[in-house]
Swiss-Prot record:
Homohexamer. Forms an RuvA(8)-RuvB(12)-Holliday junction (HJ) complex. HJ DNA is sandwiched between 2 RuvA tetramers; dsDNA enters through RuvA and exits via RuvB. An RuvB hexamer assembles on each DNA strand where it exits the tetramer. Each RuvB hexamer is contacted by two RuvA subunits (via domain III) on 2 adjacent RuvB subunits; this complex drives branch migration. In the full resolvosome a probable DNA-RuvA(4)-RuvB(12)-RuvC(2) complex forms which resolves the HJ. Gene3D superfamilies: 1.10.8.60, P-loop containing nucleotide triphosphate hydrolases, Winged helix-like DNA-binding domain superfamily/Winged helix DNA-binding domain. This is Holliday junction branch migration complex subunit RuvB. PANTHER family: HOLLIDAY JUNCTION BRANCH MIGRATION COMPLEX SUBUNIT RUVB, PTHR42848. DNA binds at residues 294, 313, 318. It comes from the Bacteria. The lineage of its organism: Bacteria, Pseudomonadati, Pseudomonadota, Gammaproteobacteria, Pasteurellales.
């Protein structure tokens, strides 16, 4: 199954972009959760503005859907500068990056999503740009080729990635600020759901907000998607009023259980328990057993299951925990 087809997928979906922009916080004061990140960024931004300097280059990493792009835009708004957005796979040629860099104004932000997917050639262009605000460009070809240096205005590179370990050391070491985004707790997600409901003029009870939040896998993007689907259900079944009971009914219809699991999560956990006696089981064997790519298991399914204590990664393989048996209604003695 394609990850983006899941209602609880943390991957962005194109049709959600317009609504997401409308409900996205613009300033740190509106940014809910991630208290350590918020406090640090407030200090770093104020210090840069006091010194009339560009903010240090910033790397933001963490699971998808936690607000890396949102934070990059907030930084630009707080600094009062423009932000130019691109992504690693889009920057295929050094000239593409050079064009973006030379069009930056002083202190502007260049935001590169999926920065771990930059090609080595693009990284080579970035190194002097990040360190010295200089751009090395080759003019001509063959024996007549020569290198010229262009001065760039002071700027901030903000890179976002779900796979910080895939960044090369030379690139990672050039970021002066590194921030990791963690899964959100239910209280913070409830606040996010309430804020989104207010932006969308929804009639949402506090209990209804909590019901959506607790099934959102610690991820704001999922919370906002579930809220929109619950709104649809409430519009048809309850005159647009979202109560706790209406939210529960809608989420049951969507096959999202109280833990935020869908059938793919249950399929994975059941495979470990029923086919491999609870583990340990190697990733390749597990992928074959459930018919999914190992990357999908490693990057999409496992992080939340591990964070919630349903799965353990060990040197010998994946192991189901006692919480898994309890959730599946299976006795450990069976």
């Amino acid at each position: 199954m394609i990850e983006a087809d899941r209602i609880i997928s943390a991957s962005p979906q194109r049709e959600e972009e317009v609504v997401d922009r409308a409900i996205r916080p613009k300033l740190l004061t509106d940014y809910v959760g991630q208290p350590s990140v918020r406090e640090q960024m407030e200090i770093f931004i104020k210090a840069a503005k006091l010194r009339h300097e560009a903010l240090d280059h910033l790397l933001i990493f963490g699971p998808p859907g936690l607000g890396k792009t949102t934070l990059a835009n907030i930084v630009a708004n707080e600094m009062g500068v423009n932000i130019r957005t691109t992504s690693g796979p889009v920057l295929e040629k050094a000239g593409d990056l050079a064009a973006m860099l030379t069009n930056l104004e002083p202190y502007d932000i260049l935001f590169i999503d999926e920065i771990h997917r930059l090609s080595p050639a693009i990284e080579e262009v970035l190194y002097p740009a990040m360190e010295d605000y200089q751009l090395d460009i080759m003019i001509g070809e063959g024996p007549a080729a020569r290198s010229i240096k262009l001065d760039l205005p002071p700027f901030t590179l903000v890179g976002a990635t779900t796979r910080a370990g895939s960044l090369t050391s030379p690139l990672r070491d050039r970021f002066g600020i590194v921030q990791r985004l963690e899964f959100y707790n239910v209280d913070d997600l409830t606040s996010i759901v309430k804020r989104s409901a207010a932006c969308l003029n929804l009639n949402l009870s506090a209990d209804g907000a909590y019901e959506v939040a607790r099934r959102s896998r610690g991820t704001p993007r999922i919370a906002n998607r579930l809220l929109r689907r619950v709104r649809d259900y409430a519009d048809v079944r309850n005159n647009g009023v979202i109560t706790s009971e209406i939210a529960k009914q809608a989420l049951v219809m969507l096959d999202v259980d109280p833990q935020g699991f869908d059938f793919m999560d249950i399929k994975l956990l059941q495979a470990i328990v029923e086919r491999f006696d609870g583990g340990p089981v190697g990733l390749d064997n597990l992928a074959a057993a459930i018919g999914e790519e190992r990357e999908t298991i490693e990057d999409v399914l496992e992080p939340y299951l591990i964070q919630q204590g349903f799965l353990q990664r060990t040197p010998r393989g994946r192991i189901a925990t006692t919480r898994t048996y309890a959730h599946l209604g299976i006795s450990l003695s069976e």
